[in-house]
Amino acid sequence: MANREEKRNLETIPVGSLGIISLPGCKPLGEKVDQYLVKWRAERESEHKESLAFAGYQRDSYLLDAKVPRFGSGEAKGQILESVRGTDLYLLVDVLNYSMTYSLCGNENHMSPDDHYQDLKRIIAAVGGKARRITVIMPFLYESRQHKRSSRESLDCALALQELVSMGVDNIITFDAHDPRVQNAIPLHGFETVQPAYQFIKGLLRNVKDLQLDSNHMMVISPDEGGMGRAIYVANVLGLDMGMFYKRRDYTRIVNGRNPIVAHEFLGTSVEGKDMIIIDDMISSGESMLEVAAALKERKANKIFVFSTFGLFTNGLDKFDKAYENDIIDKVLTTNLIYQTPELLQREWYINCDMSKYIAYIIDTLNHDSSISDLLNPNERIQNIVAKYKKGEL
């Protein structure tokens, strides 16, 4: 893929000088993305390199200096400390990084998704319309779980998208949106939801040996009806069968803002003796995921691997530790698109899937105004890595 990107990108002129602003909660990911871009562009040879259109194409870093200082009252302002006039600007933001804190009237306050979203708007406001183009890369889409209205509820995700577009954002790139149809709120602007299926499969195959990738020995499971699309895609590219659970809820009661789940009912063929891949967009508390894994174990499933784009682990890691000790789960794979605690990274059952190279490819390609269709469809790359695994070359 790298060679294909090189060839395609060299055929087009960049939209503008590339600039990346990594908001405070997203610094480590932004630095990794920057390293890839610096390396690729330093090695890239082109007869047009000296032309004016390629001015500032090769630099030591594409990260621009920006900060969001706060007053003692907790109010903040966005500051960009270098010129962004004419740049093709990419803003990286992790709205789930609760490790970030600020002082509020002498008290330490942890940043909520609302705080991160406000900081993003402050930086866009600080740009002041000077950038050639603004693309927001928001891996976990802000308020994406509030994508539809039930009774008298606010449509926060749609409001946020419309607000960003009204501020001059041209494209919004997110990963594994809870419901991609939320883009209906901004039908005339760019919205891409990227799937990390290739990175999950690569992470699993590199860390777990002796897997038999066929429908007699492995199966893909969707833990609920909402995640069927992801499971169907992975099942199809790997040539596996798919099963699903649906949640039976008690609609007479509301607990913590939602109807409680009474039971997980399974639909699918026999799972006995097969390895399971459970795939979902996020692990919140993880209770549903562990209940599904336990239900599969009761049906005599073999190893259980969990793929989840966003590992929130809102109730801590203890339940996952216990499930691992009791042989209910074998591995949990999530991405580094959101904040990961040091404790999570040390867990024996955890595999981290690095997405920085993928983001760098997307930024590099978009900066040249090239199509990212190949990047959004990883089928060819998945087939290549599966073939290598079967030959024992991984």
PLM segments and residue spans:
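PRPP-associated nucleotide enzymes
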Residues: 1-394
